[in-house]
Structure formats: C-alpha cells, structure tokens
Amino acid sequence: MNQQLNNLTLPIYMDYQATTPLDPRVMEAMLPYFTTKFGNPHSRSHSFGWEAERAVEEARSRVARLIGADTKEIIFTSGATESNNLAIKGVAKFYGNKKNHIITVVSEHKCVLDACRYLEQEGINITYLPVKPNGIIALETLKNAITDQTMLVSVMAVNNEIGVVQPLKEIGKICRARGVFFHSDIAQGFGKIPIDVNEFNIDLASISGHKIYGPKGIGGLYVRKKPRVRVTPLINGGGQERGMRSGTLPTPLIVGLGVAAEIAYSEMEKDTKHVNYLFDRFLNNIHSRISEVYLNGAKDPRYKGNLNLSFAGVEGESIILAIKDLAVSSGSACTSASLEPSYVLRSMGIGEELAHTSIRFGIGRFTTEQEIDYAVNLICSKIDKLRKLSPLWEMMQEGIDLKKIKWAVH
C-alpha cells in the first residue's frame, strides 16, 4: 500500500535493477496499438497489417541506433532471458559439430549460467572465468582460456547485482583476434552506458525492455550480419525474425521498447548526470554517518545506478524488514527469495559474514533528491538500532574474527 509523507510516496522504489517504472511517454506511445492500431504486423494484405509493420520497423531502427547496429541485426524476443538462451544455445547448436568450448564468467546472470550448465549436459565444455575482488575479469585469464575449440565468449556489460562494468572493448578485441564469437548480456547497460557493437566487436547482445523504462515481456537480440553469426532457433513456427524467432510480434510492446530506446538515446547524458549525483549523495552521506559500510564491486568502472552495500554486523534480511519504507532487495530479484548469500559476492571472495549483510539499492531516472535523503536517514537510524541488538556487531567490537564462525544453514 502506498502512503504519503511530506510529499513523499512510500514505499520509495529503489530496486531499479529488478525492473524500472514505465516512462509515461512510453505508455502514451503504446496505447493506440492496444486499441485502434491492433493489426498483425505479418498481415501483408491490408492497412492494419501495414501500419503495425511500419511501427515495428521504426522501433527496430530505434533499438539498433542505440547500440550502433544495423536495423536488420535486431531480433525481437520476449526478454533478456530468452535472448541469452537463444544466443548461447543457438550458437552451440549451430557450430557445435565444429567446436565444443564456451567461456563465460562465474558472476554472470543466472540465466546465462543455467544455459551453460544445460550445454555441459549436452557435451559442451564450459570454462567459468573467476573475477577479481572488484568484480571485474582479468583479461589475461580470458586470453589463456581461449583454445582452438572455443566458439563463444559470453561476458555481461553491467553486473545486475553489483553494477560493475566489464571491459567490453578489450574483450571484443581479444575475441576478434582469435576468431571467437563474443556475446554480451547488455540488459543492465543498454541505454545507460554507451555501447557500440562495432567499436566493441560484439557479435551477439541481449537486451530487455523493462530495464530501460519500457514494458515487460519484450526484449531483443542483436545478431551480427558481417561477419555473419548463425544461430539455431529455439522456437519453430512461421519463420519470423529472419527465421531465428518464430511467433507473432507483440506490436504494442515493441513500440514501447522503441520509444524507451529513443528516449535513452537522447537523454542518456542527462540520466547519467542525475544518477551519478544521487549515487555520490547517497554513498557520502551514509559513510559520513555510519562505520563499517562497504561498497561491493569497483567504484569505477561502474554503472552508478547500482549501490550494493554490506553493513557489517547486521543480517541483510533484518535490514530489509527494518527499512520496509524502501523497496530494495538482497541480491538479484531472480534469487532474492533464497536465503543463501549471493553467489556474485562469493565469487569476489567476500566472506559469508559480509555477503549476508548486503543490500542492493537502485537509483534511476525517477529517483529524487528528497527520496535519497529520506532513505539515508532511515537506513542510518535503523542500522544503528539493529547493531545495538546484534550479537555479531558486539563480537566485532570485541575483536572477534567473524570469519572463524561456523554459519548454520537456514
């Protein structure tokens, strides 16, 4: 239930990595395609179909422009999970009789890791690269992992849990030099940081509508045409989307994604400035008021709409309950129902005692300075109270090493 407090609507939304609110301009553009402009974009014999097809193609070109791609290289899907599966499994199925090795990273999104585990059962060899304590891969490790059997390297642009930005340009250069396809899950970076598929030598890129103030249920896969990348489709049917993704296209959702991409293209600089300012305000004010708060992942390069913080001596779950006026999560939305510490934080070498205390705060286009100040005040007062009640915090103050404590499974 929403409630009002000093012109603030509570709870305050700070979970922008899980999803973003629909931009009102996106909503406005979509509405006619639910009502009067309802044609099937594949109907070639009348104006309803032509009108829908025109709208779809305009959206496709807007999405392409945001990442420097050719319009024909964008395939519409239901979202980034499907795009990741299509890219990874599609390449493996098409090229699997020639090569049998894929490289990814231990801290990738769960859908990438699960697609790779599925392929392992099919006989494909997968290398999971480690990350440094700052969450970023070592390029030397990637170079050493590539063999003449490697067909694909999959590394995300911006991590969904900790916001660090991987060195895509350097990874792309390495892959191109070795004749290996480079796939990137850019869902958390699309429209938020500059990404150019040609400059970065990206061959496949997965995007999502609802991470950029667009609708849920729509995403895309960029598939390079030159040099050509082939993927075996996951879905068979009418052969839409260059034969890679059959099914009637959802025109209203595609229009929404296109407008969201257009807004991101023209307002990225403004959004970045806004988010960076609020990130600094939030982090500096927290650090000035409470001790033993750690930012997980590199501060730079990072998408600053993501603050993953560990509050030493307090359980993450109890923090979430205490700050229920803030909509936040511990870990990614896909796995936050689990009480296990985040596998992303563990992959960075963060111990259980700190991994258990982490909260992800998201800042976005519609976050206000007033909301940030309210959040800081609430967090500081609640952490203070929780620490007074916390035996862990007491033990830390007494100099007991929490790393030596045996944690019971929940």
UniProtKB/Swiss-Prot annotation:
Pathway as given in its UniProt record: Cofactor biosynthesis; iron-sulfur cluster biosynthesis
Active site: 334
InterPro entries: Aminotrans_V_dom (IPR000192), Aminotrans_V_PyrdxlP_BS (IPR020578), Cys_deSase_IscS (IPR010240), Cysteine_dSase (IPR016454), PyrdxlP-dep_Trfase (IPR015424), PyrdxlP-dep_Trfase_major (IPR015421), PyrdxlP-dep_Trfase_small (IPR015422)
Keyword presence, Iron-sulfur: yes
Main subcellular location: cytoplasm
Binding residues for [2Fe-2S] cluster: 334
Binding-site residues, pyridoxal 5'-phosphate: 80-81, 160, 188, 208-210, 248
Cellular localization per UniProt: Cytoplasm
Modified residues (N6-(pyridoxal phosphate)lysine): 211
EC number annotated for this UniProt entry: 2.8.1.7
Keyword NADP on entry: no
Alphabetical UniProt keywords: 2Fe-2S, Cytoplasm, Iron, Iron-sulfur, Metal-binding, Pyridoxal phosphate, Transferase
Reaction catalyzed: (sulfur carrier)-H + L-cysteine = (sulfur carrier)-SH + L-alanine
GO biological process: [2Fe-2S] cluster assembly
An example molecular function term from Gene Ontology annotations: pyridoxal phosphate binding
HAMAP family in the cross-refs: Cys_desulf_IscS (MF_00331)
NCBIfam families: IscS, PRK02948.1, PRK14012.1
Recorded family membership: Belongs to the class-V pyridoxal-phosphate-dependent aminotransferase family. NifS/IscS subfamily.
Subunit architecture: Homodimer. Forms a heterotetramer with IscU, interacts with other sulfur acceptors.
Protein name per UniProt: Cysteine desulfurase IscS
Origin organism lineage: Bacteria, Pseudomonadati, Pseudomonadota, Alphaproteobacteria, Rickettsiales
Originating gene: iscS
